[in-house]
Each structure stands twice: as C-alpha cells, then as structure tokens.
A protein has these predicted regions:
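Active-site-proximal alpha-helix that buttresses catalytic centers in soluble enzyme cores
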Residues: 2-130, 141-213
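Mobile, glycine-rich extracellular loop/lid and propeptide segments
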Residues: 133
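Short beta-strand segments
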Residues: 136-138
Length: 213
C-alpha cells in the first residue's frame, strides 16, 4: 500500500509579497535575517504556517472532507545545495518553515532529503508512504508544467501512478489580483493506496485576510 491522499501547497509568503513592498524575511527565532532574508518567510508567511494547523488538524480541521490530517510531511532541503542542482539560486528555507508549526503539532518529522529541483524523486518517496501526505514546495514546480516547460510535481504524480486523466489540474500555478497565489491546496486522491489517481480537487485555504474563495 502507498499514499492514499497527496496534498501539495506552495510555501507561505516570501519577501515581496506585500503588493510589491519589500520586507525582509524572518527566521524561526523572529530575527530579521539580513542578507539571508530572501530565503525565509515574511511575518505574514509565518501567520499562514501557523494557520495551516487549523486547516489540517482536529479539533479545527480537516476543514473539508477533501483534506486529511497528514501522516507524512515533505519539503525541499532547506540547507544543502545538491551536487547536480544546476539552479543559480541556493536552497530556500521557506517550504520547510511553512510546515514547522504543523510538524510540531503532529509531532512528526519533515522529510527534507530532496533538493528543490529533485521533486521527481521526492514524489517517488511520497507515493511510497502509507497514508496521507502533505508536500510544501516552490510554486513554479507544483502544477502540471514548470516555468521551464518540463513536467511539474502534479505531472510526476500522474505519471508515476500510471494516471492518464488530467482532472482539470492547472497547467501553471494559479494567480490572483496580487500575483501567484499562496492560499491553495492541490489534492490528489488514491483511496486504495495503489494504482492511478482517482480524483483531484483544487481547494482554497481561506485562512488569512485577503485569501480568495
């Protein structure tokens, strides 16, 4: 048996999220991170990270029957730049930081064994988990197609499960009035834990002021 539900979120808000105004990122100690700030969440992002507990964990959540309390958590490696990572950017702390409050509430570890460009291998690991999985990643790689035109996490989930239908999965990450959205959950269902994906739901988190329905 493998993953029965795979839920994917974009990391929470980063510098530049306040309608273009520049604010430094803040680390988990509440210290403005200086030159390293671009790798961290801003204060609004930390608010969303905390609010994810109410989205996924009793007694407040799961908020809808489409969600489940995750038994396994995945985020891109926040520290190491992997040897075959060709990105000009170093690793980001944001996906990991997005799941820290939830991980603490659930007393579960966050699997960060895969670099941010190694999401195909991450999907393989996630699909092998027995139960509900939550993944936090950079938004450019979550939809069917990445910003460079390659297969994204959603396409990897379909391909690796032998799923032929597309289920109206967005080909690129959805945008709102303020740009690429932070308030969505991609939900892939596979109740048997084996074989193809049987359903897809695009959910609005509706956690913070300004989140869209």
């Amino acid at each position: 048996m493998g993953a029965t539900k795979i839920m994917v979120v974009r990391h929470a808000e980063k510098p530049g999220s306040y309608n273009g105004a520049q604010y430094a990122g803040v680390n988990n100690l509440g210290t403005v991170a200086g030159d390293d700030g671009a790798k961290h969440l801003v204060t609004l992002g930390w608010e969303r990270a905390g609010a994810l507990v109410t989205l996924f964990v009793a007694p407040w959540g799961p908020k809808t029957s489409s969600l489940a309390t995750p038994q396994f958590l995945f985020a891109s490696d926040p520290i190491a730049k992997h040897d075959d990572d060709t990105s000009d950017e170093g690793p980001s702390q944001r996906p990991y930081e997005t799941l820290t409050a939830l991980a603490a509430k659930l007393s579960r570890p966050i699997d960060t064994s895969h670099g941010k460009n190694h999401y195909a291998k991450m999907v393989t690991s996630a699909l092998a988990c027995d139960g509900a999985v939550l993944i936090a990643w950079q938004h450019e790689d979550i939809a069917l197609t990445t910003k460079t035109g390659g297969p994204g996490i959603s396409q990897e989930i379909l391909t690796q499960t032998g799923t032929t239908g597309k289920f109206n999965i967005p080909t690129s990450w959805p945008s709102g009035p303020a740009g690429a959205r932070y308030d969505l959950v991609f939900v892939f269902d596979r109740p048997s834990g084996d074989g193809p994906i049987t359903g897809f739901t695009l959910l609005a988190q509706q956690l913070l002021a300004g989140d869209l329905p």
